[in-house]
A protein has these predicted regions:
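A structural signal for short, hydrophobic beta-strand segments that form beta-sheets
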Residues: 48, 76-77, 154
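Short, charged beta-turn/beta-strand-edge "cap" motif at the junction between a beta-strand
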Residues: 61-71, 81-83
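Short, well-ordered loop/turn sites that connect or cap secondary structure elements
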Residues: 49-52, 69
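Residue-level recognition of conserved beta-strand edge/terminus positions
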Residues: 26, 59-61, 78, 146
Length: 175
C-alpha cells in the first residue's frame, strides 16, 4: 500500500489504487456446464464493491479491465475471502473477522480425521460425532478493504457469452 500520510497530498483514492480483488464469476448458463472465470477488479471499480453485502446485485461493467468488462451482465455476490483466506459468512452482518462457534456448514466440514494402521498400511478415517462444534474465524458479509476474492454468479446475461468476452472457448476452460 501507499504509505504516505494523508496530509502529503495523498487521497483515499490513491490508497485504494494499490488494492485489487479477484472476481470469480460463475457462469450459470447450462450450455457452459457452470464454468468459472477469474477476473480482476481494480482502480475506481473497486469502490463500487466496497460496502456491498452477500446477496447484493452489481453491474458487470465494474468487473474486468479494458475490453474484457462484463457490460450488460448483472452479477450477484455469493461470497468471498479476505487476504488471509478467511471465508465470508452471510450470517455475520459486520465487515471484520470474528470467531464464532459453528456446526457443520459454510467454512467447517464437521468431522475429525484419524490416522490408523489397518492391515499393515495407514488409512484415514473420518469420524463425525453428533453435535460437533468448533470455534472458527469468519469474515462478515460486507466487502471491505481486506477482501481479496469475491465470488459472483450471473443473474442476468448480456447478448455475448462470457467465453466470447474473455476470449476463451469452452474447450480451454474445461481443461
Amino acid at each position: 500500500l501507499n504509505t504516505r500520510p494523508m496530509s502529503a497530498g495523498c487521497s483515499r483514492v490513491d490508497i485504494m489504487a494499490d488494492t485489487t480483488f479477484v472476481a470469480v464469476v460463475n457462469d450459470t448458463d447450462s450450455a457452459n456446464n457452470g464454468s468459472s472465470y477469474n477476473m480482476t477488479v481494480s482502480g475506481n471499480n473497486l469502490s463500487q464493491f466496497l460496502g456491498k453485502k452477500i446477496g447484493d446485485v452489481v453491474d458487470g461493467i465494474f468487473v474486468g479491465e479494458g475490453e474484457q468488462t462484463l457490460a450488460g451482465y448483472k452479477l450477484e455476490i455469493t461470497g468471498g475471502s479476505d487476504k488471509t483466506g478467511t471465508p465470508m459468512r452471510s450470517a455475520l452482518s459486520v465487515g471484520n473477522r470474528q470467531s464464532i462457534l459453528v456446526t457443520a456448514s459454510t467454512g467447517f466440514k464437521g468431522h475429525n480425521l484419524v490416522h490408523k494402521a489397518k492391515g499393515g498400511e495407514k488409512k484415514r478415517f473420518r469420524y463425525k460425532p453428533d453435535g460437533m462444534r468448533k470455534r472458527r474465524y469468519f469474515r462478515g458479509n460486507t466487502i471491505t478493504q481486506d477482501t481479496r476474492q469475491i465470488n459472483l454468479k450471473v443473474v442476468e446475461a448480456a447478448n455475448k457469452s462470457l467465453a466470447d468476452i474473455l476470449g476463451t472457448s469452452s474447450e480451454e476452460s474445461s481443461e
